C-alpha cells in the first residue's frame, strides 16, 4: 500500500465517525493540522444539505439540554428518572458526564418547548425527536423514558436512546432515534466520545 492509501483511510475514518462529507472531512483534517486549503463555491444543493445537517445537530444539542433539565428540575423527572438511575447505581458524576436525561410522559412536551424556543418542526422530524402524523398530530418519540444521548467522535449529539420506565406499558422497552442524515447506527458506538477523552 502506498502513502495515498493511508491518507484515504484517514479521510474515510473521519467521514464515518464524524458523519462528515468527503469535503468536510478534508476541512476537518486541514484545520486540525493547520493546513490551508483553497475551496470552490458549493452548489445550492450542497449548501442545503450542509445547512440541514447543521440544523439537525443544533436541534439535538438543544434536546439534550432539555432532557437533562427535565431530569433535574421537573418533579416527574426527579421522581421517575433520577430514581431509576439511582436504583441502578448510576452516580451523579456519571449521569452528568454522559448527559443523561428524561423525557416527560406527555404527548408533545418536547415538541411544544422546541417550537416555543424557535426550532422548526421539519428538523424535529428529521432527527426523529418527534413523530408527525398525516392528520397534523405530533408525538414526542421518547416520552416517559430516561434518555441516553449518542455522541459522535467529535462530541456532537447525533441521536438518542430511550428506555421506558412504566412496567405495565405495552410498548417497546427501548426506542432509538431513526437513521438520518446525521445518524447511521452502524457507524456509532455508544460512549466512544467519552472513551477518547481518557
Q: Which residues are covered by each model-predicted region?
A:
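Short, small-residue-biased leader/transition segments that mark boundaries at the very start
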Residues: 2-7
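Conserved, well-folded catalytic cores of nucleic-acid-processing
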Residues: 17-20, 32-36, 88, 117, ...
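Conserved active-site segments centered on acidic
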Residues: 24-77
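Phosphate-handling DNA/RNA-contact segment within nucleic-acid enzymes
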Residues: 48-63, 104-198
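OB-fold/S1-family RNA-binding modules
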Residues: 81
Amino acid at each position: 500500500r502506498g502513502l495515498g492509501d493511508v491518507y484515504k483511510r484517514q479521510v474515510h475514518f473521519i467521514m464515518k465517525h464524524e458523519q462528515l462529507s468527503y469535503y468536510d472531512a478534508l476541512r476537518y483534517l486541514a484545520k486540525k493540522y493547520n493546513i490551508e486549503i483553497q475551496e470552490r463555491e458549493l452548489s445550492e444543493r450542497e449548501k442545503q444539505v450542509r445547512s440541514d445537517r447543521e440544523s439537525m445537530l443544533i436541534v439535538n444539542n438543544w434536546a439534550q439540554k432539555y432532557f437533562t433539565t427535565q431530569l433535574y428540575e421537573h418533579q416527574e423527572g426527579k421522581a421517575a428518572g433520577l430514581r431509576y438511575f439511582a436504583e441502578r447505581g448510576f452516580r451523579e458524576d456519571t449521569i452528568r458526564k454522559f448527559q443523561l436525561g428524561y423525557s416527560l410522559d406527555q404527548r408533545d412536551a418536547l415538541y411544544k418547548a422546541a417550537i416555543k424556543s424557535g426550532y422548526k418542526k421539519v428538523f424535529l422530524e428529521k432527527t426523529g425527536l418527534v413523530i408527525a402524523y398525516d392528520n397534523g398530530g405530533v408525538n414526542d418519540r421518547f416520552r416517559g423514558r430516561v434518555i441516553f444521548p449518542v455522541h459522535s467522535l467529535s462530541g456532537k449529539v447525533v441521536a438518542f436512546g430511550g428506555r421506558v420506565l412504566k412496567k405495565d406499558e405495552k410498548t417497546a422497552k427501548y426506542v432509538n432515534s431513526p437513521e438520518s442524515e446525521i445518524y447511521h447506527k452502524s457507524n456509532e458506538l455508544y460512549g466512544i466520545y467519552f472513551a477518547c477523552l481518557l
